[in-house]
A protein has these predicted regions:
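Glycine- and small/polar-enriched repetitive beta-structure motifs of secreted/surface proteins
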Residues: 1-80
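Intramolecular chaperone/auto-protease modules of tailspike-like proteins
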Residues: 79-208
Length: 208
């Protein structure tokens, strides 16, 4: 059983236990199950998660026009040691961080240039030319560049551990899981501190 509220919400769904609220919310999902879509066009091509068709156990909030998200407190992410196993030390650190290229940019969404299809918007209809770009600056990384660094480092293991998330099977919509950068940054700081302490000790010896 699916639950849908809104025009064409879950219109093509054959899977079960999907929930959608909003016009066209979850409109592209077919055999996918246990998904949640909240807001206008949530889950269509161009939305934050791309077009979800056969995917399951996913949550999508809103479409590509969302500019802010508000919550009173921080998200709490499950991290109980008792629910984990096969621990190994993370080997991505300072060298990986040094290779990252932070940038400022303006969004120029492909969905603004394409026609609406049954799965959302045709993201390959036209090449963005700047006529629909936003007038505000954002900061971050380019997903394709981070993916190349992941692959080079041998870290591109699975969609659940990768820094880069390609939400659709055809790779039309790529994103970054920024919270996963935190352990890497911690490792980089630790490596840098070890180097600083080593150099400080050498200087002390030379000066002594």
């Amino acid at each position: 059983t699916n639950t849908a509220v809104g025009y064409d919400a879950l219109v093509a769904a054959t899977g079960a236990s999907n929930t959608a609220m909003g016009s066209d919310a979850g409109g592209s999902v077919t055999s996918g199950s246990n998904n949640m879509f909240l807001g206008f066009h949530a889950g269509l091509s161009g939305s934050p998660g791309g077009a979800i068709t056969t995917g399951s156990n996913e949550i999508v909030l809103g479409d590509e026009n969302i500019t802010e998200a508000h919550v009173q407190v921080d998200w709490t992410v499950a991290s109980d040691q008792r629910d984990k196993t096969d621990f190994t030390a993370l080997d991505l650190g300072l060298d990986f961080v040094k290779a990252l290229a932070p940038v400022t940019y303006k969004w120029d969404k492909r969905s603004k240039y394409g026609d609406k299809t049954s799965e959302g918007y045709d993201l390959n209809a036209q090449t963005p030319d700047g006529t629909h770009k936003e007038d505000w600056l954002d900061i971050g990384f380019k997903a394709q560049e981070v993916e190349a660094l992941e692959i080079a480092a041998g870290y591109n293991k699975s969609s659940k551990t990768n820094l880069v998330s390609s939400h659709t099977g055809d790779g039309k919509q790529m994103g970054l899981q920024y919270s996963k950068f935190v352990p890497i940054l911690v490792k980089a700081i630790q490596e840098q501190q070890t180097l600083i302490e080593s150099l400080t000790a050498r200087i002390t010896t030379l000066e002594g």
